[in-house]
């Protein structure tokens, strides 16, 4: 009986959280977004909006922990606060990944699906925060580089959608690599795990696990894109002994492959993925 009551409470609390999230998003889009555009200074307006989002998600994560829906274990959170503008590259096991990362990163911008620009709960948020749409690959890189130059960390899930299975990732797209190369900024790999699985691609919001789910976040050491490309490239260089820089396309492809392999390997090393499954 106690277990059933606990399950029912967590189901109710989860539903309440989604309602609060949706209502607050709608109110933000309808009220705060129009008012924000009255603010004359664009840079300070964006800073104000992203700060509000950061603290709202911090409160939401704290609420989910307080009501017993989730637990959160973070290693290396200081890097998200203190590294300066970087490209955060993370795997994407659950719907809450972006909520957690925005709660941990004070000055952050996201690459988000173009569909959110028409979503009544999100259209105002993504515009006021000047998040970057994935609709146009070229503009995605240009806009992300501008955000980094303005002092924001870019949060990117290169799988493009939530992971297909607990022990498997989608292939990484190259957008994050082009951004890191254009902005000449480090990549900060982040590992995310959710146990038991919750809010995956295959689950509905009401598919509450049998116990509180635990999200683990491990922030790895930053990776210098140019150094990684040089390391991954051919050591021989050109016939005359010089080392020619690879084309942007080849550099992005090399960087994407290396970071994807790095994150996959670390997911096994840290026990987020289980060998043999």
Feature names for model-found ranges:
Residues 69-71, 107, 128, 151, ...:
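A generic structural signal for alpha->beta connector loops
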Residues 29, 59, 120-124, 210, ...:
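Generic alpha-helical secondary structure signal
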Residues 59-60, 96, 121, 142-143, ...:
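Short Gly/charged-rich anion-binding patches and loops
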Residues 64-65, 126, 147, 180:
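A generic structural signal for well-ordered alpha-helical segments
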Residues 34-55, 66-67, 82-136:
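Catalytic core of membrane glycerolipid acyltransferases/transacylases, capturing the structured
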Residues 1-86:
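Membrane-anchoring hydrophobic helices of lipid-metabolizing enzymes
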Residues 4, 109, 138-277:
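Non-catalytic C-terminal accessory region of glycerolipid acyltransferases
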């Amino acid at each position: 009986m106690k277990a059933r009551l606990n399950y029912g409470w967590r189901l109710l609390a989860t539903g309440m959280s989604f309602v609060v999230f949706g209502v607050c998003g709608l109110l933000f889009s309808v009220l705060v977004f129009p008012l924000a555009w009255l603010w004359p200074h664009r840079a300070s307006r964006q800073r104000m909006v992203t700060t509000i989002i950061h603290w709202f998600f911090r409160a939401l994560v704290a609420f989910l922990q307080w009501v017993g829906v989730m637990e959160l274990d973070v290693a290396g959170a200081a890097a998200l606060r203190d590294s300066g503008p970087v490209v955060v590259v993370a795997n994407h096991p659950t719907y809450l990944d972006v909520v957690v990362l925005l709660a941990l990163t004070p000055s952050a911008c996201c690459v988000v699906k173009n569909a959110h620009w028409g979503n009544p709960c999100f259209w105002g948020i993504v515009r006021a925060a000047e998040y970057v749409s994935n609709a146009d690959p070229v503009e995605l890189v240009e806009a992300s580089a501008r955000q980094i130059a303005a002092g924001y960390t870019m949060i990117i899930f290169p799988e493009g959608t939530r992971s297909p299975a607990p022990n498997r990732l989608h292939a990484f797209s190259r957008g994050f690599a082009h951004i890191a190369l254009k902005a000449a900024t480090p990549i900060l790999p982040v590992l995310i795990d959710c146990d038991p699985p919750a809010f995956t691609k295959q689950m509905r919001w009401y598919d509450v696990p049998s116990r509180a789910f635990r999200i683990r976040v491990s922030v790895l050491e930053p990776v210098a894109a140019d150094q990684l490309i040089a390391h991954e490239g051919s050591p021989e260089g050109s016939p005359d002994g010089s080392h020619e820089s690879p084309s942007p396309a080849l550099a992005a492809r090399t960087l994407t492959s290396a970071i994807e392999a790095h994150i996959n390997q670390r997911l096994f090393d840290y026990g987020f993925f289980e060998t043999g499954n």
